[in-house]
Amino acid sequence: MKLIDTHNHLYLEDFDPEQDQLVTIAKESGIDTLLLPNVDTSTIRRMHDLCDRYPDFAYPMMGLHPTSVDEHYAKNLKETESWLGKRVYCGIGEIGIDLYWDKTYQKEQKEVFEEQLRWSIDLNLPVAIHTREAYPEVFDSLYKVGADTLTGVFHSFTGNEAELEAVSYTHLT
C-alpha cells in the first residue's frame, strides 16, 4: 500500500528544529509522499526549499489560504498565481473559505477561492480545500465554477451529514 500525507505544512518555521527528523520519521513510518499546500506569499520559498531537499518525497501545491486573504489580497493572489508558470505543482491549495475566526473578508475569500478553482480547472490540477463554518459558501462556489470537473480533497471535514452528502456528488473526497 502506498501512503500519502495529503496535507501538511512541515516547511513552516515552527518545524525548523526537527524538520529533517520529522521527514525521516515519516519515511520510516511508511509514508511515501508528502503533499505540501502553500499558505501565502511569505511561505512559498520555504515550501520550495523543503521540496528541493526531498524531490522524490515532498511535492508542492500552490494557493492562497483563506485566512491569508486581507486588504492586500489582489496583490497576493497575483503573486501566488505568477508561480504557477515557474514550477511544477501537484495541486492548487490550500484554498477555501474560513469564517470561523473572522468574517471581515468574506466577500474577498469567496472571490479568491473561485479564482483558484478556475486555476485548478485550467491546469487540470486537484484542489486541497480548507473550509470552516462556510459550507454553504464553499458549495455555492464549487457549483458556480464547476464542481463536476474538479478533483481533490477537503483536508478537514467538520460538516454535518447533509454536507457530507453534498460532497459525495462531486469528485472531491
State what each model feature region is:
Residues E13, V69-D70:
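A generic structural signal for short coil/turn motifs at secondary-structure boundaries
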Residues T170-T173:
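Conserved small/polar residues in nucleotide/adenosyl-binding loops
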